[in-house]
Amino acid sequence: MNTAPFKLEADFASALPTMAAPWQGEEAPNPELVILNDDLAYSLGLDPTWLRTPEGVQFLLGLNPEPLTKAVAQAYSGHQFGQFVASLGDGRALLLGEARSADGVLHDIHLKGSGRTQFSRGADGRAVLGPVLREYIISEAMHALGVPTTRSLAVISTGRKIQRGSVAPGAVLVRVATSLIRVGSFQYSNISGGIELSQHLANYTITRHFPSLVAELSAPTPATYVSLFKAILQRQADTVGKWTRLGFVHGALNTDNTLISGETVDYGPCAFMERYRGDAKFSSIDTYGRYKFENQPMILGWNMARLVETLLPLLGATPDEGMTAAQEALVEFDDLCEQAIRKEFATALGLDESDTGTVEQFRELLYLHNPDITTLLRALTDNTAPPSGFEAFVHDWKTQDPDIEAMRAVNPLFIPRNHLVEAALADAVEGNLEKFHELLAAVTNPFDPTAGPDELRLPSEEGFEEDYMTFCGT
């Protein structure tokens, strides 16, 4: 056997065994590595050469015990479209363990589509190639755009044919996160283990994500957990600020899809708008627009309220003190989101974040004229003609001496536009990955004009977005 040159840790499984069910991936009849993210593998101390061996592919499927310590399915609850489900968990996923990057940070190595677990609730636990490649390309694009996100390490085709409306090739996604601790993780700890387990999970979260609070864990006080909650709020606000600047619609902001780290997770029904509008939604199952673009800050606030409900006994010496502390922190979330959004747009416009007047004027024009935000911001960056309705704004904006070099670093030329992603995936599931690799090269170097052909910069044809719909699909 080709021995693995690394071994994963089992940090989560060891620290929180009641939230981790030991499990193993499903055997694949004819596994084949479709794509491997070499740079990400190197950064995590994982040898790409070994990962390409048969033993490496088995490891990526959760089957080779050599580099594994204790693969587990994680337990969590969740509000899905506002409805609480007490036991969700990894129904088709596995945490293989954690890899430690050169800076000492632990990263979850996590499978999606690895087969049934005890949380599958009757589903087959599998995933199909198109949606798996979709998550790969969009998550890596988001990383390149500077958005906190889970990342994609590999895609493996399983050789299995999966029934999803039509027959599709089976696949497994190997994704990476600084952790997959969710709001739903705290909801599960609260109902299954009460405040003792919730405090244990909170302490573990601090060690994984908030090192400035670690020193307080030797003798934690209510202030420790208030600080934790405030830090989580800030991370959510920072992320939604970036989504808002980029015109990104997540589409499934359930509490089980809201990571404590602030990283974006679950790219099934997401989309990038090409007409900037508050009512934009693309998910086929978001019938009433709960997760439409303009609702994202509000929904994250709602999710944060569900989180703090699980922490109330930790936030004060008495129930009243805990409730007061929670309310005082939570009431600030709207302002945190607004500050983050204004900061993002100020940076995109090359202005100081204190210039709120210009930023607000720009935002008003976005909702009035519904431009393609990517094209518009690059037009400003490159001093080309802006779309109709922005002429007067641009004239005034230029008088403020915007920092054009700073703008070049944040305003992309390439994003994973919906029509381009769909075309690449349609070819990929038929075995032709040429368009996929071409688009991946462009969107992972989004500020480099030489990263892809000019047609990858262009919006879709008129009318495409009006009919475009996304599906979880996996």
UniProtKB/Swiss-Prot annotation:
Q: Where does ATP bind?
A: G89, G91, R92, K112, D124, G125, R175, R182, D266
- Keyword vocabulary terms for this entry: ATP-binding, Magnesium, Manganese, Metal-binding, Nucleotide-binding, Nucleotidyltransferase, Transferase
Q: What class of enzyme is it?
A: transferase
Reactions mediated catalytically: L-seryl-[protein] + ATP = 3-O-(5'-adenylyl)-L-seryl-[protein] + diphosphate; L-threonyl-[protein] + ATP = 3-O-(5'-adenylyl)-L-threonyl-[protein] + diphosphate; L-tyrosyl-[protein] + ATP = O-(5'-adenylyl)-L-tyrosyl-[protein] + diphosphate; L-histidyl-[protein] + UTP = N(tele)-(5'-uridylyl)-L-histidyl-[protein] + diphosphate
Q: Does the keyword Magnesium apply?
A: yes
Q: Which residues cross the membrane?
A: none
The active site consists of: D256 (proton acceptor)
- Note the superkingdom of the native organism: Bacteria
Its EC number(s): 2.7.7.-, 2.7.7.108
Q: Name one GO molecular function term.
A: ATP binding
- Provide the binding site for Mg(2+): N257, D266
Q: Which cofactor does it need?
A: Mg(2+); Mn(2+)
Under the heading HAMAP family, the entry gives: YdiU_SelO
State the protein's purpose.
Nucleotidyltransferase involved in the post-translational modification of proteins. It can catalyze the addition of adenosine monophosphate (AMP) or uridine monophosphate (UMP) to a protein, resulting in modifications known as AMPylation and UMPylation.
Checking PANTHER family in the record gives:
PROTEIN ADENYLYLTRANSFERASE SELO, MITOCHONDRIAL
Protein family per UniProt: Belongs to the SELO family.
Q: Per its record, how is this protein called by name?
A: Protein nucleotidyltransferase YdiU
* Native source organism of the sequence: Corynebacterium glutamicum (strain ATCC 13032 / DSM 20300 / JCM 1318 / BCRC 11384 / CCUG 27702 / LMG 3730 / NBRC 12168 / NCIMB 10025 / NRRL B-2784 / 534)
